[in-house]
Regions:
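A conserved ligand/cofactor-binding region detector
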Residues: 1-158
Length: 158
């Protein structure tokens, strides 16, 4: 007997249910918005890691170089929403959540501010990182992690 090939949406839904059960011991109907956010984020991280490994292997095989980008801040925006959009999964995930009467916008709201910047420099750095990803350039962004949140800059007698 042949095993039925699942669609991308069916696979995602099964992963979602399984991860909620394994990681949080709840069903989708019982899960809090925070638990759903954590599970969806973990699912996307796993997908991105697989894609990254494939990309790294490919660039290494052709002798590709790597860019290291240093900035005081990165204003990346909401990672879950951006990742779902970039992986073309917004419609599937929205539909899966709708099956359980869950509003995806409430899940997006669970994401904490990364605290990596608040100005034009941070937005520019994020655009450079997006551009590298879009163009297939292997790169990593480095910044300072502030212990007490985003800093304020003030020029005194200058």
């Amino acid at each position: 007997m042949e095993k039925k090939q699942l669609t991308q949406k069916e696979e995602l839904k099964q992963q979602f249910i399984d991860r909620l059960q394994l990681d949080c011991s709840v069903s989708p109907d019982e899960a809090s918005d925070s638990q759903i956010y954590q599970v969806l984020s973990a699912m996307m991280v796993q997908r991105l890691k697989h894609m990254r490994q494939h990309f790294v292997n490919k660039t290494n095989s052709i002798g590709g170089k790597k860019v290291y980008y240093l900035s005081m801040e990165f204003l990346m925006g909401r990672s879950l929403k951006t990742t779902l959009y970039n992986l073309e999964l917004v419609d599937d995930v929205t539909s899966i959540l709708n099956d359980y009467h869950i509003n995806i916008n409430q899940i997006y709201e669970q994401e904490p501010d990364a605290g990596l910047g608040n100005g034009g420099l941070g937005r520019l750095a994020a655009c450079y990182m997006d551009g590298m990803a879009t163009d297939g350039v292997r790169g990593t962004g480095y910044s300072i992690r502030y212990e007490h949140g985003i800093f304020k800059q003030k020029i005194v007698e200058g």
